[in-house]
Amino acid sequence: MIHKYDYHKTHFLFSTSCIKNLLYNVSKEIAFTGSSNVGKSSVINTLTNQKNLARTSKKPGSTKTVNVFEVEPGVNLIDLPGYGYVTMPVALKYHWQHDLIYFLQKCTNLKGLVVLMDIRHPMKFLDKYIIQCAIENKIQVFILLNKADKMNAYACNTQYHTVQQHLSNLESNIKITLFSSVTKLGIKKLKAQLDSWFSIVS
C-alpha cells in the first residue's frame, strides 16, 4: 500500500562534506542529483512548499555539501552537490563524482534517484553516466526535465521524446516528466513517485 507523505512538513536535518557519511544512515532515502545550475534546490523548495528550505543561488555549483532533509522520522530527502560545473577545481570535481558513484554502489537505504536535467540541454555525458551507474546498482531512476517554463509546449514535447529515445536502449523502466518550479508543472507526478518509492518494503 502506498503511503501519502506530507512533504510540506519537511525540515533540514544536517549537512556533510563527505557523502560517504550517508552510508551509516538507517533512514529510507531518496536522492536528488543533476549537473550544476539545473535547479535542484528550487525543485526541493517547490516540493516542500518552502521558499528557503534548500538554499538557491544564481551561481552554478553553490551546493558543495550534501544536505539532508527529514520528511518524517526515518524518511529523508538528500540534496547532492551538482556535478560537472566547468569552473569547479578539477580535483574537487572528480572527488565529488567519485564519491557519488561510491554512494550509488554502497548505499543500501537508497530507494530511488531523481535525476534533474535542464530541458534545454538534456542527457549530457555525466547524466548518462550517473543513470547507467544507478541501473547497474539496481537503483530506480526518475528523470525531471526541469525548467519547462523556458520553452513552449512543442519544444518541450520534442525534448521529452529525445530523452525517451536516448533511454530506449537501456534495460530499465525509467520514468520521465516535465517539471517547472515556476508553474508547478510535474509536482503531482514527483510526489506520487516519491510516495511509491518510500512505500517500498525492504
Swiss-Prot record:
Q: Per its UniProt entry, which superkingdom is the organism in?
A: Bacteria
Checking Pfam families in the record gives: MMR_HSR1
Q: Name one GO molecular function term.
A: metal ion binding
Q: Keyword set for this entry?
A: Cell cycle, Cell division, GTP-binding, Magnesium, Metal-binding, Nucleotide-binding, Septation
Cofactor dependence is on: Mg(2+)
Instruction: Give the CC-aspect GO terms.
Output: cytosol
Family per record: Belongs to the TRAFAC class TrmE-Era-EngA-EngB-Septin-like GTPase superfamily. EngB GTPase family.
Q: What is this protein called?
A: Probable GTP-binding protein EngB
Organism encoding this protein: Baumannia cicadellinicola subsp. Homalodisca coagulata
